[in-house]
Amino acid sequence: MSDKWKDYVLMLIDLQSAFYPEGTQAAFPELPANVERVVATCRTEGIDIIHIRSRFRKDKSDWMPKYKKGNSIPCIEGSEGIKVLPFAKELRGEPVLYKQTFDAFLLPDTAELIQKINKRLVIIAGLVTKTCVFHATLSSSQLFPTGIVEDCCASPNDHEESLQRLDAYVVGRTRSDTILKDCERWREHIMNS
């Protein structure tokens, strides 16, 4: 494995059962194969992976106000919804961070980890495009050049619209079968950051 991709990191967001229900599965049936492909490519080529997951306490002490009011939240500890989708499980040594917010970058650990492991370009994939992926991508783009793997994201509503809204902030979109070509193209953004 070379260090050609040493400046890149793939961030997988909320690839958990609660965020891939039957309706989303029907609308995005290729998501599992696409995520498997991009994860395998990154692991083979030496692009580090960070896993970001939602996790909330049963006692509601860390629930966002919107959910406290509605008395319901996905990804409660011990629930079915918190389970990691089989195609997105971490390998030993791949960091996993847990969040109680839409935006992974509201956790100080997220940016600190990316800086600590000397990454200069963030590639984002995950669920749900219009919420957690959207918020994390916006925040990431303020700190690092950021790309998004469009066929490794899904949202029951507003998927394409969310991606279009992010176009102004990202270095570009990629797909699971073109990620290396696009990472090469994005290298200029690392040099200029």
Regions found by a protein language model. Give the residues of each.
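Active-site-adjacent betaalpha module
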Residues: M1-V9, R37-A40, T44-E45, N71-S193
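A short alpha/beta connector and helix-capping loop motif
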Residues: K6, T24-R55
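Acidic-leg catalytic submotif of subtilisin-like serine proteases
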Residues: V9-L15
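Active-site loop/turn elements of alpha/beta-hydrolase fold enzymes
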Residues: L15, S54, D151
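Short acidic, Gly/Ser-rich segments with clustered Asp/Glu that frequently serve as metal-coordination loops
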Residues: Q16-P21
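Short glycine-enriched, charge-decorated loop/helix-capping segments at active-site entrances
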Residues: G23-P29, K68-P74
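Early exported N-terminus immediately downstream of N-terminal targeting peptides
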Residues: G46-I49, R53-N71
